[in-house]
Amino acid sequence: MTKLEKANSYQEQNRIDGNEKPVFHITPPVGWMNDPNGFSIYQGKVHLFYQYYPYSDVWGTIYWGHCISEDFIKWKELPIALAPDENYDAAGCFSGSAIETKEGHVLLYTGVMENEKENGTKTVIQQQCLAIGDGICYEKVKDNPVVPAELLPSGFSKEDFRDPKIWKEDENYYMVAGNKNEQSNGQVVLFESQDLKNWKYLSVLIDNQGKYGKMWECPDFFSLGEKHVLVVSPMHMQADGQEFHNGNQSIAIIGEYDKKNYHLLDEQMISLDYGTDFYAPQTLQTEDGRRVMIAWMQSWDMNIKPLAQKWNGMMTIPRQLEIRDDILYQNPVKELEQYRTEPVILEEKEISGTCMIPGIHGRVLDLTLELLDGDYETFTIYFAKNKKYFVSFRYVRATQSIEFDRTYSGMIRDVVCQRTMKLKKTEKTLKLRLILDKFSVELFVNDGVQTFTSTFYTSLTAEDIVLECDKTALINIEKYKIELDGSKD
């Protein structure tokens, strides 16, 4: 039995019951999940691969898990796509991407192999490798690695050269990957190929100028509206005021692409999410032209899942990206709306003190609150609540900020529980859209100007939702339960 066959057999024999897991967020069948990989359209269906270690709920020698969807919301688990079974990827099949070609579904990933230096020091070499398949089964090409580390200019790190993102443009294929320069600062390198197997180095698309963390992971480069966007995840990034508190952060650099010199002229850099659990996002372009992003809904530094839980890791809900008036907006894909049931819609509801509203409770919800007017100074929403537990968002009017608190969510270890997000764009009204799915919350502020993503593993018996206002607030409320066929919250 091959390594891949053994892993697939283990996955089938140890698959975890779906009722123990979120309803519409991707989780591993069993074991560990991290970065999304190969987010792509193939033969009209959405494919998502992911960093996967089925044998434990902690990170190990990485495989590629695989799932498929027709609408971004209902996902079907497929057999494991890649195993670390060759010399060039024996230490792991690290992150990468996918593209549809005439030859089939092409996966471009980082193969990690152990290496011993002349002085006996053990290290690794990271190189880019190719596999081609039919949407279910994939075969690695005999020419691997197709982008060997030797193609990098002198002084560029061969140990940190990973996470290729591929696209096709003007009949050629292009790839960006994360790398380190001679000063050990992060940079994104750009390569070109005509046939996917023979690649040449073009340029440093952009580097971090010693400002934005160290190694840059999981780059993704695309046009959006009239701009170009580089999504990247810097490691060891310093906090700046109320920005960049995760250490391992995800940012977007927006600017103009100098195609002649293969260089991104950056105009603005923004945090992609202000929560505790968001990393390594990747995007695709849909057949109707939308740019959709998904990310790992967890953090390397804040693993809080219960000890008895045999799966570890989730993905965010896929989000549509748009740039309007130089602002990057993120919102849940529209496909979520077809699964909304049991509506509760209230207009100009007056909230004073603490209250629970009939029909508004549960842990699998799409809930929007729009604060219209009032003399209040603070407005708080508590969710996943009972007499013992709660998670909350509090809007503080004087500071134009939102405070998150999961201190009382029932965690078993001491991690970051509180965080404050300063509002970037203030409006006459404040709109808060919460997507809840058992063990996570994704907050979209003012139609997606800012987002805040966090996990919590509170007992599912805690399902109350409580609104609290220090004085009086006039609000609109729109609540839906999210229900897939046969799902249970």
Regions inferred by a protein language model and the residue ranges of each:
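Beta-rich accessory regions
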Residues: 5-12, 250-489
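Beta-rich carbohydrate-recognition and catalytic domains
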Residues: 1-163, 168-211, 223-274, 297-347, ...
